[in-house]
Amino acid sequence: MDGFRCDVASFVPVEFWLQARAAVAAVNPDCVWLAETVHRSYGCLARRHGVYSASDGEVFRAFDLEYEYDVREVFDQYLRGEVPLSRYLDALSFQEACYPANYNKLRFLENHDQPRIASFVRDVRALVHDTAMLYFLKGTTLLYAGQGFENDHL
C-alpha cells in the first residue's frame, strides 16, 4: 500500500489521524496520507451547528497533502467567469501565509465530487490553459480519469 486517501478527514478528530498514522508508520514509514478536507464554507457551517470540523492547518498535522477545498469556491467562481483569476491567486497567497512552509495541496479541475470541467468550460483552449496552470502552482496536480479527453459526463 502506497498511501491512504481519507474522505472528509476534517470531520474526524486530528488526534485519531495522528494515532492512525503512527500505527501505519510502524509498518510502512513511507505511506502517503491524503486528506479530502471540506469547503471552507461547509466547515464553518458545521462548526456553527456544533459539529467538529478541523481546519486545514490542523489537518496538516497528520497528513502529507490535502485537497484544495479551502480555496475551491473561489476557483469555481473563476472557472464560471464570475471573478477574475487574480481573486483565486489572492486565495493562493493566503495559503502561503497560513500553512506550514512545506504544505502540499492537491490541485485539480475535476474529481469524483465535482462536475466535469468540460461540461461547463466549453472553450478547449481555456481547458488546456487551466490544466497547464495547475502544473505551475505549488502542490500536486490531479488529472481525473477522462479529463485529458474532454469528457463532459461522469
Report each predicted region and the residues it spans:
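Short catalytic-loop micro-motif centered on adjacent basic/acidic residues
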Residues: 3-9, 117-118
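Active-site-proximal helices and loops of the catalytic beta/alpha 8
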Residues: 7-100, 105, 122-124, 133, ...
